[in-house]
Amino acid sequence: MYVIHLAEADESNASISSEEDLGHLDYSKPFAAKQTQPKKSISQIIKDKKKQTQLTLQWLEDNYIVCEGVCLPRCILYAHYLDFCRKEKLDPACAATFGKTIRQKFPLLTTRRLGTRGHSKYHYYGIGIKESSAYYHSVYSGKGLTRFSGSKLKNEGGFTRKYSLSSKTGTLLPEFPSAQHLVLQDSVSKEKVDTLIMMYKTHCQCILDNAINVNFEEIQNFLLHFWQGMPEHLLPLLENPVIVDIFCVCDSILYKVLTDVLIPATMQDMPESLLADIRNFAKHWEHWMLSSLENLPEILSEKKVPIARRFVSSLKRQTSFLHLAQIARPALFDQIVVTSMVNDIDKVDLNSIGSQALLSVTNDQDSDFYSEYDSISVFQELKDLLRKNATVESFIEWLDSVVEQKVIKPSKQNGRSVKKRAQDFLLKWSFFGARVMHNLTLNNATSFGSFHLIRMLLDEYILLAIETQFNNDKEQDLQNLLEKYMRSADASKATFTASPSSCFLANRNKPGVSSSDSAVKDEIPPEDDYLTLAAAQQGLGAGTVVYHSADPDNFTIAGQMDFSQNSAPLMTPPISPAMMNRSSVINQGPMAMRPQTSCPIQGQLPCQTFPEPLYQSLHNPPSGSYPNASYYQPMFRTQTHTESGRYAFSGHHLSKDCFSNSCTASPYGTRGSSGGYTAAGDAGMETEAVQMLESSGFGFGGTTGAADGCSGPVCSSGHRYYGSSSGYVDAPRMGTFIDQHVSVISSVSSIRSVSAYAEAHDPLNILDDTSRKTRPYYTELSAMGTHTAGSSIAHSCSVSAPCMYGAPAPYHSQNTLLPLQGATEIREMMSSLPPINTVFMGSTSGPP
């Protein structure tokens, strides 16, 4: 027999592991028997194979279902298939062939390798067992009686990392009931009820956040602040029975999420300090609530306190059980201890204990109650589990079946009270266990301490399972109460059964669809609302939002805008109203208070900005994406000026203010951004001027990053959009810009004027390269300086920012300005500029 060892690949379609799928060999018929069978024709073999495949597909349809987020061990599924073949008297296919058959039925099924190194197993991801299947209870042990039921599969592989509340950071509460769905009296304002429920949900979210941060002491302050600081106009609502019952429903939702967050259902080990903090929190919770409800209507405390007590009791019970499970787990893994326990329990005469007077007394009316024979059989099963070196999870699975068979199911069959049946079971279970411990004491059992620990663990879980059943009944009463007040029963069920979400976890119930729940903070924002970096790297393309409005006066920003109805990514996300007209105190560099020496700013419009690395990665959209640019700040708009308003470059001299010692940056980073577009009627923008724009800057053209920059009249009047290129001539310089920190808050309203020309930063002395000087343009020249002799210049200004380099060059290179103007202007300008080696080399010699 050959054993196939798998690689670490996760997406395996046909391979099997060495430990999983060997059972099919048991079904192989002896070779001699096969020789005696009549040989089938090829057509008959194909026909039988096709028939068996159809039967297998139908069997898969009857027993399994697509279930997003569920993992099922591949060996278990193959074992089910072998059982099916045995019952149907079919020759089972190998695991590889069976894997292909599964994918015929579930084409989207994937395979994952889960578990620690050396103990990993392959799992089918995205498939689950139907509850109607005969295999459901054998794998999941039913739905389980507690949160810890069914954790066997989750813990398979032996995860040992301790539980941390930091893994729950970002957990959000599900939706609370809405006043729009409540049946209220006409005198009750739905607006006030909605306000009160919204306030209470915020209050509950604060409690949850502080619990996750292990800041339990602060929770008392939140309780006092909310209830004792209730606004006067909302106080009458606290006397309304419907509103109080809705508070109880909200409390139940909060307690469910708190329990899920504080206590891991996978029975991970928890730090002792965290367990102590949770116990202390449970100890004080009821007192904190009663203190916060003083001087408020009595109906509040009458309804809220019983629910709080159930929550506290459940929290204490679960922490106690989890603590005992952590202590008992090493004992159950110790083979010497387990062997000693088995030897000691074998010396106990269980029949003599069962025949004692208390257990032998029966009532004719309650003849179906838990008897002494049941006690003996249960403890016999316990001995068998110890012999099999069962884990804590196996004991839980066994106890679930015991409580289900001995308490819950008989109560449902004969209509008797579950509480009465549970009381009888607990009485006889405790008595039988005490007599077993009595015998161990008399026999001087060496494993008495270990057995006492195991017994405490079993007792605690049985109490937890029964209490959970009682709590579930109370939860059902709240559900019925909510349905009574809701207009739609479906709405009440959706609200009450909603699961907590996480802002760091995607919604698994609806993959690929953005959640409509406003309380759910998705891990990835909806693609309809924002332009993510991944989308930006793929280019805007045809999905770019096209703005058709040509009237800039009709476009205003009032508060936070909602772009949820758009079907394509937007360039900017909504901005907070508080940030719209607030100046920045972060980006105030040396140019912050400089008087205006360039063109004046036109009408100002608040503009949202992105960090520079995002815009460096954006590809240019197709032309015509942003006609008229009416949705942007004036510095990014197409600006049309009359002939008299244009600035001829030859008619103006550049002052030294244009060459300051600070960097200038647009709101998108340190790279120069164009301050204006050439208007449709402006013919001054010629091809040679366009050559000043290179793909490394934020050009206006649609270039895809060619190394030679823009070629041709790419900045003509037909291209009215703001684009950027992802191509950069100098890769090291690109990395330098990406590594720089770009502050989140940028100056929005009080835009400070800067010089009409950006500086060329060269911390690595790249511009000193003679081979680069021969080029007709430089990558770092701002697009604001794209002018030719005799052409007009559009009014533009940029936002100043601190220089991102240690020692920026305060002046432009002479060679940088050579393509801009004629010989006369160059000579006049050179008289006011220092030599290039003085700027970049620190030399005091004259110009080269």
UniProtKB/Swiss-Prot annotation:
Disruption phenotype: Impaired endocrine cell differentiation and accumulation of islet progenitor cells. Gene3D superfamilies: Winged helix-like DNA-binding domain superfamily/Winged helix DNA-binding domain. It is found in: Nucleus. Expressed in progenitors and hormone expressing cells of the islet lineage. Transmembrane segments: none annotated. Its main location: nucleus. PROSITE patterns: RFX_DBD (PS51526). Residues 56-131 bind DNA. GO terms for biological process: endocrine pancreas development; glucose homeostasis; pancreatic A cell differentiation; pancreatic D cell differentiation; pancreatic epsilon cell differentiation; positive regulation of DNA-templated transcription; positive regulation of insulin secretion involved in cellular response to glucose stimulus; positive regulation of transcription by RNA polymerase II. InterPro entries: DNA-bd_RFX (IPR003150), RFX-like (IPR039779), WH-like_DNA-bd_sf (IPR036388), WH_DNA-bd_sf (IPR036390). GO terms for cellular component: nucleus. It holds the Pfam family RFX_DNA_binding. One of its GO terms (molecular function) is RNA polymerase II cis-regulatory region sequence-specific DNA binding. Keywords: Developmental protein, Differentiation, DNA-binding, Nucleus, Transcription, Transcription regulation. The keyword Transcription applies. The keyword Cell membrane does not apply. Belongs to the RFX family. Transcription factor required to direct islet cell differentiation during endocrine pancreas development. This is DNA-binding protein RFX6. It comes from Danio rerio. The lineage of its organism: Eukaryota, Metazoa, Chordata, Craniata, Vertebrata. The gene is rfx6.
